[in-house]
């Protein structure tokens, strides 16, 4: 019998036996994952008053929701976010703001977890704003600090909030300044701001904190190489981390080297000579000394008036930054600019027009359009 005849008989058999298990191809009817009787209830949006009331009461869930609203890029959220910030402002400003940065591998998260638990044990309420790097290629963010700081996240006196940097210079989240206000209004009296690493970016963090702490690891070759002078000049306090085991001697040597280097810098405007400490998050040694150094610095600048002077200067700086950000956003959202900017970009890439002339003409388009809208 030929294969053709076999195929014919198999087809004929299949056509006349529809109920055989071998011929069932679709299986039983798939049941819905969610019951058809279940009605998804839409979450009711909180009013500005409810947000503010919850924040002032120290409600962490509402605080987190408010921060998400402030960080949102949705224009519809902007007005309410600003109302919340404005209502919280009279209750803010009473915390100590500490910026913490360091070279890659300096163990910032480990150090923050160790000293953070210690600070919380001193009856402080601590907020940790861990600013994660956003990828320049994909715009994604690691947001991994909560996994690296497991024990501190379970401390009832500590609030950890990782925020994407949104590609901004230095890894500072676009709305970190407003987040600080909300955390202070919620009753947190110590705020740590962890940055992504050493670079130009740290200038932004320095402009929103009372104390700038620089972490450095020892035993990485020439201790003074790989760290920019500008970052060292901004530091009010330096910590050599991982000073334990066989690394203790290297840490002490690094401490001496950095202390000597810092003496060569001019005395800062605060009148404070930065100090260098060693610590170990593993053995918990040196943490109390570091915190004592923080308290000494804060006492010094409060007595000589630099504390308030610095905050006033920071407020002025952020006023201008807010203006710049608002103008930049208005420019790129303008319909006339959106319609022409691609054309100008192409002409610049083809060397048909200089970048300066392109910018000038795009600004003229923007101003003409805004005047027309008026």
Model-derived segments and their meaning:
Residues 1-90, 338, 342, 359, ...:
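Non-catalytic terminal/linker segments enriched in charged/polar, low-complexity residues
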Residues 47-58, 63-101, 106, 110-201, ...:
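Nucleotide-state-sensitive switch-loop elements of NTP-binding domains
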Residues 48-53, 106, 239-244, 275-280, ...:
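Short hinge/gating elements
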Residues 63-65, 278, 289-367:
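Long, well-ordered amphipathic alpha-helical subdomains in the mid-to-C-terminal portions
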Residues 142, 179, 204, 208, ...:
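Alpha-helical scaffold elements adjacent to nucleotide-binding pockets in ATP/GTP-utilizing enzyme cores
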Residues 147-148, 224-229, 264-268:
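Short beta-strand/turn micro-motifs at beta-sheet edges
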Residues 220-249:
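Flexible active-site lid/hinge loop adjacent to a nucleotide/diphosphate
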Residues 237, 243-303:
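Canonical P-loop GTPase G-domain recognition
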């Amino acid at each position: 019998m030929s294969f053709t005849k076999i195929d014919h008989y198999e087809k004929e058999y299949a056509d006349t036996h529809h109920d055989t298990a071998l011929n069932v191809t679709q299986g039983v009817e798939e049941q819905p994952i969610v019951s058809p009787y279940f009605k998804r209830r839409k979450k009711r949006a909180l009013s500005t008053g409810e947000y503010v009331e919850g924040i002032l009461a120290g409600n962490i869930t509402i605080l987190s929701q408010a921060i998400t609203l402030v960080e949102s890029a949705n224009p519809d959220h902007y007005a309410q976010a600003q109302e919340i910030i404005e209502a919280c402002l009279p209750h803010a400003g009473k915390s100590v703001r500490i910026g913490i940065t360091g070279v890659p591998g300096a163990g910032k998260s480990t150090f923050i977890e160790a000293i953070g638990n210690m600070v919380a044990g001193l009856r402080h309420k601590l907020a940790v704003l861990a600013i994660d790097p956003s990828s320049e290629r994909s715009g994604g963010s690691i947001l991994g600090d909560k996994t690296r700081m497991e024990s501190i996240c379970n401390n009832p006196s500590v609030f950890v909030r990782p925020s994407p940097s949104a590609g901004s210079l230095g890894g500072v989240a676009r709305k970190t300044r407003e987040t600080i206000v909300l955390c202070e209004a919620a009753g947190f009296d110590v705020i740590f701001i962890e940055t992504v690493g050493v670079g130009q970016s740290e200038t932004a963090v320095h402009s929103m904190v009372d104390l700038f702490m620089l972490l450095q690891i020892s035993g990485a070759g020439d201790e003074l190489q790989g760290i920019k002078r500008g970052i060292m000049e901004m530091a009010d306090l330096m910590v050599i981390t991982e000073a334990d085991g066989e690394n203790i001697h290297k840490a002490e040597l690094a401490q001496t080297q950095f202390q000597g280097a810092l003496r060569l810098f001019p005395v800062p405007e605060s009148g404070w000579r930065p100090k260098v400490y060693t610590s170990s998050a593993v053995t918990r040694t040196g943490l109390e000394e570091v915190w004592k150094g923080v308290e000494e610095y804060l006492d010094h600048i409060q007595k000589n008036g630099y504390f308030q002077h610095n905050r006033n200067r920071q407020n002025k700086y952020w006023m201008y930054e807010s203006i710049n950000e608002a103008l930049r956003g208005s420019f790129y959202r303008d319909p006339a600019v959106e319609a022409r900017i691609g054309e100008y970009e192409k002409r610049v890439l083809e060397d048909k027009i200089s970048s300066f002339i392109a910018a000038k003409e795009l600004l003229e388009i923007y101003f003409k359009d805004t005047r027309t809208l008026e």
